[in-house]
């Protein structure tokens, strides 16, 4: 079964990647790299780290057209900062992967459907 693991961070808790020192980036990057290497057989798409939510643009479809605004689609402190796609036997295995991720305060797990 394929699952998307979305890595979420609390924007008010600690520095963002861009705010970290090069040394802190290297340390955390190494931990994340090891996590990817240890789980390479189960991760089928390494995904990407996403830019800060302050760089987001949102299109809201309304009657009569779309409204485009700067910023994320929800107001809140916790935002998606990256993702991977895992191919694992079941949700329990996806949870085991999520529990070992070395960064981010929350990992949201969603199954992928066969529908586009």
Question: Where do the language-model regions lie?
Answer:
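Conserved, structured core segments of small domains
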Residues: 1-116
């Amino acid at each position: 079964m394929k699952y998307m693991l979305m890595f979420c961070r609390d924007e008010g808790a600690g520095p963002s990647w861009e705010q970290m020192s090069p040394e802190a980036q290297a340390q955390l990057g190494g931990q994340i790299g090891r996590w990817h290497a240890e789980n390479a057989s189960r991760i089928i798409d390494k995904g990407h780290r996403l830019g800060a939510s302050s760089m987001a643009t949102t299109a809201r479809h309304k009657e009569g057209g779309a409204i485009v605004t700067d910023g994320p689609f929800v107001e809140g402190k916790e935002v998606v900062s990256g993702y991977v796609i895992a191919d694992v036997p079941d949700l329990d295995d996806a949870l085991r992967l999520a529990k070992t991720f070395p960064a981010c305060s929350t990992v949201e797990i969603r199954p992928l459907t066969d529908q586009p």
